[in-house]
């Protein structure tokens, strides 16, 4: 099984937002980006807190990618429970920190090819999951993820954004997992 590993030289680059940074928190961020979310082909949420506030604001993402952590610490039970309230397909995958496993990549691709809202629960870390979400999402989709201690990032999926993500993924180190 193939694993993409984040090289040291990409770490600083990926700390920069991939889309528009909304300097706000919680439902306020969702409200500020709501026109884009309503117009989006699909809505993808990456991260437990991002997913929580989208659900709280009554936006049901087509795909939610969570790891039950925020800033490397477990999320509160109330946040986990909010995720469980919906009726959607649940997929469990492994994805160690600083990587994108083939298992996660396949789960994102398959989820975005389907019609059923899906929650991917990552054992490990989902920090890089916005990359395949952008790559595999239909054009016109919105990918939302948190920028720790700053706000939320909204990425509208365009052909140019997909090419940018392909370039980033090509620069990651490929390893074979036994």
Curated annotation (Swiss-Prot):
Keywords: Coenzyme A biosynthesis, GTP-binding, Kinase, Nucleotide-binding, Transferase. Pathway: Cofactor biosynthesis; coenzyme A biosynthesis. The keyword Zinc does not apply. GO terms for molecular function: GTP binding; kinase activity. It is an enzyme of class 2 (transferase). It holds the Pfam family DUF359. It catalyses: 3'-dephospho-CoA + GTP = GDP + CoA + H(+). InterPro entries: GTP-dep_dephospho-CoA_kin (IPR007164). The keyword Transferase applies. One of its GO terms (biological process) is coenzyme A biosynthetic process. Its EC number is 2.7.1.237. Transmembrane segments: none annotated. PANTHER family: GTP-DEPENDENT DEPHOSPHO-COA KINASE (PTHR40732:SF1), UPF0218 PROTEIN TK1697 (PTHR40732). Catalyzes the GTP-dependent phosphorylation of the 3'-hydroxyl group of dephosphocoenzyme A to form coenzyme A (CoA). Belongs to the GTP-dependent DPCK family. This is GTP-dependent dephospho-CoA kinase. It comes from Methanothrix thermoacetophila (strain DSM 6194 / JCM 14653 / NBRC 101360 / PT).
């Amino acid at each position: 099984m193939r694993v993409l590993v984040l090289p040291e030289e990409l770490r600083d680059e990926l700390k920069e937002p991939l889309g528009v940074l909304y300097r706000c928190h919680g439902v306020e961020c969702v409200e500020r980006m709501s026109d884009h979310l309503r117009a989006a082909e699909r809505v993808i949420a990456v991260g437990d807190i991002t997913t929580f506030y989208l659900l709280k604001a009554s936006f049901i993402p087509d795909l939610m990618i969570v790891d039950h952590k925020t800033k490397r610490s477990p999320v509160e039970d109330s946040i986990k429970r909010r995720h469980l309230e919906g009726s959607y397909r649940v997929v469990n995958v492994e994805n160690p920190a600083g990587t994108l496993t083939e298992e996660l990549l396949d789960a994102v691709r398959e989820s975005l090819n389907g019609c059923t809202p899906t929650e991917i629960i990552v054992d490990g870390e989902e920090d890089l999951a916005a990359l395949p979400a952008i790559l595999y999402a239909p054009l016109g989709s919105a990918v939302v993820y948190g920028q720790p201690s700053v706000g939320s990032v909204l990425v509208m999926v365009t052909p140019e954004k997909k090419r940018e993500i392909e370039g980033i993924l090509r620069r990651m180190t490929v390893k074979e997992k036994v």
